[in-house]
Swiss-Prot record:
Keyword ATP-binding on entry: no
PANTHER family xref list: INTERLEUKIN-12 SUBUNIT BETA (PTHR48485:SF4), INTERLEUKIN-12 SUBUNIT BETA-RELATED (PTHR48485)
Organism: Papio anubis (Olive baboon)
Protein name per the record: Interleukin-12 subunit beta
A Gene Ontology term for the protein's cellular component: extracellular space
Secretion signal, residue range per the UniProt entry: 1-22
Keywords assigned: Cytokine, Disulfide bond, Glycoprotein, Immunoglobulin domain, Secreted, Signal
Length: 328
């Protein structure tokens, strides 16, 4: 469909009285009205047009109410608050002809509302989305938190770059965890995404952009995150930990392997490792050693444990979780 046809189709559904485009189409028959949220705010005037060739005998209702709001092919409404949002339906002779769902996006003191998601405050305040990648394959996972349990939907879009975006495909959003935090329950949602034409060895010049649309009842909010894959790398823990006590010695030879999920070849995508021996009491001082090798000799006392974690050798991204094995 050409641009002109798109414009005609758009205005056959909703006409904007505001010159600032304070209403836009989220998806078919669903529109977001952007409102400055303060006492006595004027709101936005919206003119809805029934998608039908009929001209006469048309009436309008809101949601499940049978109350007739107006008649005629168009309906003019002043949207000021959530009571003005919802699904508007035009009817004729008891038959529904078309629908338009209006959602509200609040702006208070020039700042868009962030009521739906919880601020994770890591690595900094106002962090609503967090993302990690296990390797350089272009596959990554993002997650977010909310205390809302019902009437909640999410959709995710992603690309590399914004001016000339390159494809990133994201799967379905899933509820991945539930936790109790004091008197509140916290819900973690996540999504997995894959860059369509990833080149693991290439230098990244444009960041990945992730955009999450959140809808709670009739409230719309939008959250974004921008990053390079190299900045969100967090390897899986090293695997196959082996500990072999040395004869007539308190020392032990320990070894481990790269995680299966790490990029190959390992000669190019190299890891560095942090190893430590932890006594039975967590208050005991930990002896930590850093090495690029996959083996080491350590003093491993009775009732202690040996642990190792991994990090990209050439870029200071996140360390993996610890992998551990008892000393005896």
């Amino acid at each position: 469909m050409c641009h002109q046809q798109l414009v005609i189709s758009w205005f056959s559904l909703v006409f904007l009285a505001s010159p600032l485009m304070a209403i836009w189409e989220l998806k078919k028959d669903v529109y977001v009205v952007e409102l400055d949220w303060y006492p006595d705010a004027p709101g936005e005037m919206v003119v809805l047009t029934c998608d039908t060739p009929e001209e006469d005998g048309i009436t309008w209702t809101l949601d499940q109410s049978g109350e007739v709001l107006g008649s005629g092919k168009t309906l003019t409404i002043q949207v000021k608050e959530f009571g003005d949002a919802g699904q508007y339906t035009c009817h004729k002779g008891g038959e529904a002809l078309s629908h338009s769902l209006l959602l509200l996006h609040k702006k208070e003191d020039g700042i868009w509302s962030t009521d739906v998601l919880k601020d994770q405050k890591e690595p900094k305040n106002k962090t609503f989305l967090r993302c990690e990648a296990k390797n350089y394959s272009g596959r990554f996972t993002c997650w977010w938190l909310t205390t809302i349990s019902t009437d909640l939907t999410f959709s995710v879009k992603s690309s590399r770059g914004s001016s000339n975006p390159q494809g990133v495909t994201c799967g379905a959003v899933t509820l991945s965890a539930e936790r109790v935090r004091g008197d509140n329950k916290e819900y973690e949602y996540s999504v997995e995404c894959q860059e369509d034409s990833a080149c693991p060895a290439a230098e990244e010049r444009l960041p990945i952009e992730v955009m999450v649309d959140a809808i709670h009842k009739l409230k719309y909010e939008n959250y974004t995150s921008s990053f390079f894959i190299r900045d969100i790398i967090k390897p899986d823990p090293p695997k196959n930990l082996q500990l072999k006590p040395l004869k007539n010695s308190r020392q032990a030879e320990v070894s481990w392997e790269y995680p299966d999920t790490w990029s190959t070849p390992h000669s190019y995508f190299s890891l560095t490792f942090c190893i430590q021996v932890q006594g039975k009491s967590k208050r005991e001082k930990k002896d930590r050693i850093f090495t690029d090798k996959t083996s080491a000799t350590v003093i491993c006392r009775k009732n202690a444990s040996f642990s190792v974690q991994a990090q990209d050798r050439y870029y200071s991204s996140s360390w993996s979780e610890w992998a551990s094995v008892p000393c005896s």
